[in-house]
From Swiss-Prot:
Pfam families: ATP-synt_ab (PF00006), ATP-synt_ab_C (PF00306), ATP-synt_ab_N (PF02874). It is an enzyme of class 7 (translocase). The record marks S388 as: Required for activity. SUPFAM superfamilies: C-terminal domain of alpha and beta subunits of F1 ATP synthase (SSF47917), N-terminal domain of alpha and beta subunits of F1 ATP synthase (SSF50615), P-loop containing nucleoside triphosphate hydrolases (SSF52540). Keywords: ATP synthesis, ATP-binding, Cell inner membrane, Cell membrane, CF(1), Hydrogen ion transport, Ion transport, Membrane, Nucleotide-binding, Translocase, Transport. This is ATP synthase subunit alpha. Belongs to the ATPase alpha/beta chains family. Disulfide bonds: none annotated. The gene is atpA. It is found in: Cell inner membrane. Its EC number is 7.1.2.2. It comes from Parabacteroides distasonis (strain ATCC 8503 / DSM 20701 / CIP 104284 / JCM 5825 / NCTC 11152). GO terms for molecular function: ADP binding; ATP binding; proton-transporting ATP synthase activity, rotational mechanism. Produces ATP from ADP in the presence of a proton gradient across the membrane. The alpha chain is a regulatory subunit.
């Protein structure tokens, strides 16, 4: 007799079997490469792709969407073009192009995607995902620039002061010492690092030779500056897209420190090469070209990058409401941080009225203009004080420096004018002769060797001698000898009562008296 099959049992067995089946389907949007050339791929089938979205090819290479057209998307490749061919499949990642930033990046050399390229292994530490492109903080979340960023360069700190949160352009022809000013500024932050209040430095090398970047990293290591510095490098052999995105990676790393209540300095060396890389990418993407074949939004490229430098309001509850804050940063936000930018632009034959230089001059808060003639005369740093300016740094300058060097810029301008007249010969009255003598000696005082930034208190001391005419008896060729002896005397005999007080920004009659007495005693014939 056959067993009767119960309907209830069958249904329960079927139910158990069906419950064990995984019916979830993972949907991935996949496209196909239609065409690839010169670092740009045209892809069909990614109808929902977003601008600046990261795409991934089968071989692991990544690309970033830049053009959204009716029937295809144009994406820039972040790797060699020859590794991608027509017909390859591409998938969306759903992520906007970003970089994973962590404390472990400090002291490392990375590419614009955050991958280490210094051969020291992977980067460790908790990471925060920071978007490469991000809106700058609104006016509500900023405060005025009021804290100095000491460069250690006498001519800059005295006449063209830079504040934390400022954008100061360094502009000049090739081989005039633009990078040297930026590197000296980074080296000068060593004292802040040792005092426990570091200014984290990000040096972005765009389109430079690999050997140049290696030599620069070596210099920073020798001076102990890599302890608080990150180098982002996109060399001349890297794809144009990497050179284009490198400054955005530097800004994203700087924002990580800025938004967590710390101070950062980012150097873009140089934005002329970024503009050329962007022009190359835009032309291959067949975007309409404008003046000098640059795309129409080249101004917006630099303005949106440099606007990200800011001094954040010192109220954490307000700072936490900052616009476009990445989710990974929400619980780390503190107020009072800053991001200072030093963009570098290379001019051709001193032409500051060219397209890209005028754009960046109008975006930044001032410029340091370097001249080939001054450089060749031995006036280094070769700063043309007449057309160099700092529009907001004056509010951040130390009071002692402002008192001592307040007239230095005008004095030097008058000296240059009188000097050009004196070349015609003829007799000079005593006042003119004194002005020229003082100007020549001040010019000598402002000359400074490379990689030897000077603490601000020593700058104030020696510039006091120059501006007050205390070098009247010192021969012109002995000014540097006097400077070395004078500063050595202050370090050995007046560290606490003069230098330490000047460091706080205070100068009084007692200190003035000591400085004048020391200068006179030092040069007694």
């Amino acid at each position: 007799m056959t067993e009767q099959i119960k309907v209830s049992e069958v249904s329960s067995i079927l139910r158990q079997q069906l419950e064990g089946i995984h019916t979830s389907i993972k949907l991935e949007e996949v496209g196909t490469v239609l065409q690839v050339s010169d670092g740009v791929a045209r892809i069909y089938g990614l109808d929902n792709a977003e601008a600046n979205e990261l795409l991934q090819f089968d071989n692991g290479m990544e690309a970033i969407v830049m053009n959204l057209e009716e029937d295809n998307v144009g994406a820039v490749l972040l790797g060699p073009t020859d590794q991608i061919k027509e017909g390859d499949t591409v998938k969306r990642t759903g992520r906007i192009a970003s970089i994973d930033v962590s404390e472990g990046m400090i002291g490392r050399v990375i590419d614009p995607l955050g991958n280490p390229i210094d051969g020291k292994g992977e980067i460790l530490g908790e990471t925060c995902e920071m978007p490469l492109e991000r809106k700058a903080p609104g006016v509500i979340f900023r405060q005025p620039v009021n804290e100095p960023l000491q460069t250690g360069i006498k001519a800059v700190d005295a006449m063209i002061p830079i504040g934390r949160g400022q954008r100061e352009l360094i502009i000049g022809d090739r081989q005039t010492g633009k990078t040297s000013i930026a590197i000296d500024t980074i080296i000068n932050q060593r004292s802040n690092y040792e005092a426990g209040n570091p200014v984290y430095c990000i040096y972005v090398a765009i389109g430079q030779k690999g050997s140049t970047v290696a030599a620069l990293v070596n210099t920073l290591q020798e001076k102990g500056a890599m302890d608080y510095t990150i180098v982002v490098s996109a060399t001349a052999s890297d794809p144009a897209a990497m050179q284009y995105f490198a400054p955005f990676a530097g800004a994203a790393i700087g924002e990580y420190f800025r938004d967590s209540g710390r101070h950062a300095l980012v150097v873009y060396d140089d934005l002329s090469k970024q503009a050329v890389a962007y022009r190359e990418v835009s032309l291959i993407l067949r975007r309409p070209s404008g003046r000098e074949a640059y795309p129409g939004d080249i101004f917006y490229l630099h303005s949106r990058l440099l606007e990200r430098a800011a001094k954040i309001i010192n109220q954490p509850e307000v700072a936490r409401e900052m616009n476009d804050l990445p989710e990974s940063m929400r619980d780390k936000v503190k107020g009072g941080g800053s991001l200072t930018a030093l963009p570098i632009i290379e001019t051709q034959a001193g032409d500051v009225s060219a397209y890209i230089p005028t754009n960046v001059i109008s975006i930044t808060d001032g410029q340091i203009f370097l001249e080939t003639d001054l450089f060749n005369q031995g006036n280094r740093p070769a700063i043309n004080v007449g057309i160099s300016v700092s529009r907001v740094g004056g509010n951040a300058q130390l009071k002692a420096m402002k008192k001592v060097a307040g007239t230095l810029k005008i004095d030097q301008a008058q000296f240059r004018e009188l000097e050009s007249f004196s070349k015609f010969g003829g007799e000079m009255d005593a006042v003119t002769a004194f002005t020229i003598d003082k100007g020549q000696k001040n010019t000598q005082l402002l000359i400074q060797p490379q990689y030897s930034p000077m603490p601000v208190e020593e700058q104030i001391s020696i510039l006091y001698c120059g501006t007050q005419g205390l070098l009247k008896e010192v021969p012109l060729d002995k000014v540097h000898e006097f400077e070395a002896r004078f500063l050595q005397e202050l370090r050995t005999s007046h560290q606490r009562d003069v230098l330490d007080v000047l460091k706080t920004g205070v100068i009084n009659d007692e200190i003035r008296g000591i400085l004048e007495k020391t200068a006179k005693e030092l040069w007694v014939h």
